[in-house]
Amino acid sequence: MNAKHDLAEALCQLLETKTLEKITVKDIVARCGVNRQTFYYHFHDVYDLMRWIFDREAAALAQSIRSSGSDWRQELRTITDVLRSKRHLVMNAYRSVNRRDLERYLMQGYGPVIRRIVDQAAVGLDVTQGDLEFVSRFYARGLLSGVFD
């Protein structure tokens, strides 16, 4: 048993029926059959667990893209599919925290992945680092906007 993963899975299950602000540590530990001490050993609060889930998802996505060897179009589709599949989680977080904070947090996680894709697509082109950064932000914000709208 991996307690962190079990706690994360419990939170994701609860998010299917409740909003984040209505979910308590008691709900999470009851769902996965551990005690509160176990929760607090790994996380400060429910929001800390949510941040860990987003970090884990972004890292898994980045690893998947790095190892796939696919072209940048497929990589963008992969990111879109992942964001769509986690939409309930993102939207629950969106309703529970400030939109700007959530966007900033998601940009930290997904922004570098998008940047890598943009860099790959720009190989051989005469573009500045500023242009690459602009295009990366444009695509990242567009993808996130599609999730929020």
At which residue positions do the language-model features occur?
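Basic, helix-initiating cap at the start of DNA-binding domains
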Residues: 1-18, 22-23
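Amphipathic alpha-helical packing segments from all-alpha helical-bundle domains
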Residues: 77-78, 99-124, 130-145
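Append "Primarily bacterial transcriptional regulators
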Residues: 7, 26-31, 39, 83
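HTH DNA-binding helix-turn interface
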Residues: 16-20, 33-50
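Amphipathic alpha-helical linker/stalk segments
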Residues: 13-16, 23, 53-78, 90-92
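Generic hydrophobic, amphipathic alpha-helix propensity
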Residues: 3-11, 28, 53-57
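Contiguous segments within soluble domain cores/interaction surfaces
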Residues: 88-95, 99
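A short secondary-structure junction motif
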Residues: 56-61, 86, 90, 113-121
